[in-house]
Amino acid sequence: LRLKSIVSYAKKVL
């Protein structure tokens, strides 16, 4: 799990 991937996903969700 990559931190950048999580951040990008969070931006899409929010």
Swiss-Prot record:
What cellular-component terms does GO give this entry? extracellular region; membrane; other organism cell membrane
> Which Gene Ontology biological process is one annotated for this entry?
defense response to bacterium
Q: What else is known?
A: Is the only mastoparan described so far that does not belong to the order of Hymenoptera.
Q: Is the Coiled coil keyword given for this protein?
A: no
The entry's localization annotation reads: Secreted; Target cell membrane
Briefly state the protein's biological role: Antimicrobial peptide with a broad antimicrobial activity against Gram-negative and Gram-positive bacteria, as well as against fungi (MIC=15.1-28.3 ug/ml for bacterial and 19.3-24.6 ug/ml for fungal pathogens). Shows low hemolytic activity against human erythrocytes. In vitro, shows significant cytotoxicity on HeLa cells.
Chief place where the protein resides = secreted
Source organism phylogeny: Eukaryota, Metazoa, Ecdysozoa, Arthropoda, Hexapoda
Going by the UniProt record, its keywords in alphabetical order are: Amidation, Antibiotic, Antimicrobial, Fungicide, Immunity, Innate immunity, Membrane, Secreted, Target cell membrane, Target membrane
Family, according to the entry, reads as follows: Belongs to the MCD family. Mastoparan subfamily.
Name recorded for this polypeptide:
Mastoparan-S
The modified positions for Leucine amide read 14
Q: State the tissue distribution.
A: May be secreted in hemolymph.
